[in-house]
Amino acid sequence: MARFRGSITKVSRRLGIALTPKAEKYMERRPFAPGQHGQGRRSKVSEYALQLREKQKMKYLYGILEKQFRNYYKKAVSQRGVTGDNLVRLIERRFDNVVFRAGFAPSRAGSRQLVSHGHLLVNGKKVNIPSYMVSPGDLIEFRPKSKNMSAVSDALSKTPDARIPSWIQVDKANQKAVFLAVPERVEVQEPFNEQLVVELYSK
């Protein structure tokens, strides 16, 4: 599937959130939007623009293109409960996201690469589809030939235990993780308002 090839740092500054560790460091120095008038006073933002920005935040943060993102929304609508909560819970189950949450990669782009290159197993079977939906109880581990890669070991060593969410159990020594449960919305600490996304799509 095609991926965004532009400057993630510029997108991060425009949206006001750090999408990668590199963007986070850059935004500490230049926290305003890119462009000549980035530091100037901004005009009033329309309701549509606010809704669109929140959608862009979610798409770029999780690395999802429009068609697939809209499909997640449709599935969220069809489920019981609050549509926005359902949307977040669905996306959090993505394989590349779970690999990132477990600390196996410093970014979702890095975790997506690990998955796409076939380095990982789910319950003993190779899965190389980033959008694969992980289920509670699934065991995620590296293939024997892919174990102890320096990039993974480095990422794990730099991931504090406090950053690993409660719904994922990680064995750093053996580079394994178990997806314990689908998180509740309140457990997912990300800087977006999914309700505005729901309002945008429901028009």
From Swiss-Prot:
Record GO biological process: ribosomal small subunit biogenesis; translation
UniProt protein name: Small ribosomal subunit protein uS4
Keyword Lipid metabolism recorded: no
InterPro entries referenced in this protein's UniProt entry, alphabetically: Ribosomal_uS4 (IPR022801), Ribosomal_uS4_bac-type (IPR005709), Ribosomal_uS4_N (IPR001912), S4_RNA-bd (IPR002942), S4_RNA-bd_sf (IPR036986)
UniProt similarity note: Belongs to the universal ribosomal protein uS4 family.
Superkingdom to which the source organism belongs: Bacteria
CDD domains named among the record's database cross-references: S4
Entry GO CC: small ribosomal subunit
Job description of the protein: One of the primary rRNA binding proteins, it binds directly to 16S rRNA where it nucleates assembly of the body of the 30S subunit.
Disulfide bond annotation, renumbered to this chain: none
Keywords annotated in UniProt: Ribonucleoprotein, Ribosomal protein, RNA-binding, rRNA-binding
Pfam families (UniProt xref): Ribosomal_S4 (PF00163), S4 (PF01479)
Subunit structure, interactors included: Part of the 30S ribosomal subunit. Contacts protein S5. The interaction surface between S4 and S5 is involved in control of translational fidelity.
Gene Ontology molecular function: any one: rRNA binding
Keyword Ribonucleoprotein among record annotations: yes
